Each structure stands twice: as C-alpha cells, then as structure tokens.
C-alpha cells in the first residue's frame, strides 16, 4: 500500500520535473551567452538527462521513456545549415560529373 502511494507521488511529480527541465533547456538555447563555458548534467530518476555544452553552443536533450523508447533531440545553431549546404554541394558535384561523363560519351561516338 505504501509503495503504491510512492508510485502515485512520483507520477504526479514527473510533469513538474519535465517542465523544469524544458524551461532550463529553453533558457540554454535562447540565452547561450549566460551559460558560456558551462557543461552540466541533470539526472532525474534515470529518466531524463540534459547535457548543456554551450562552449560549442550545442544542447543535447535525452529522454528515456519507461517503455524503453528513446527520444533524442539535438539543437545546434549551425548544424542544419551545414547539412543543407553539404547536400547542395554533393548534388552539384554529382550533376557536374554526370554531365561531363555524358558529354564525353557523346563526343566519343
């Protein structure tokens, strides 16, 4: 009976903890200068972990559900732009190679 009461209390506390972690994460993303050169970990009942490494302006938020599913979100100011740029570069390189190869094959005939 006592264990059930503790479990219910834990379930009630989880949304509060989640909101607190979410607020901390948003602060770290929106005001990175306040957290410069700070690295910290928050572990709450082995379910949530925030790693904030603001020297590289990146935030990792890791949330493991009780069912074993994992939710992982990675925020970085320039990562998305970098990947889009790399994709465009590879597409242009691929198109250039294909056109040159096609031109070479056509002129050989």
From Swiss-Prot:
GO terms for cellular component: membrane. It is a single-pass membrane protein. It comes from the Eukaryota. It is found in: Membrane. Keywords: Membrane, Transmembrane, Transmembrane helix. The chain crosses the membrane at residues 78-98. The keyword Transmembrane applies. Its main location: membrane. Partially overlaps YOR200W. This is Putative uncharacterized protein YOR199W. It comes from Saccharomyces cerevisiae (strain ATCC 204508 / S288c). The lineage of its organism: Eukaryota, Fungi, Dikarya, Ascomycota, Saccharomycotina.
């Amino acid at each position: 009976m006592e264990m059930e009461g503790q479990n219910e209390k834990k379930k009630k506390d989880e949304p509060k903890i989640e909101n607190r972690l979410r607020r901390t994460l948003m602060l770290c993303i929106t005001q990175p200068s306040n957290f410069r050169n700070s690295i910290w970990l928050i572990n709450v009942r082995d379910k949530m972990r925030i790693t904030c490494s603001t020297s590289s302006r990146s935030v990792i938020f890791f949330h493991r559900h009780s069912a074993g599913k994992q939710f992982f979100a990675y925020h970085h100011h320039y990562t998305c732009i970098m990947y889009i740029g790399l994709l465009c570069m590879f597409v242009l390189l691929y198109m250039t190679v294909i056109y040159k190869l096609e031109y070479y094959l056509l002129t050989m005939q």
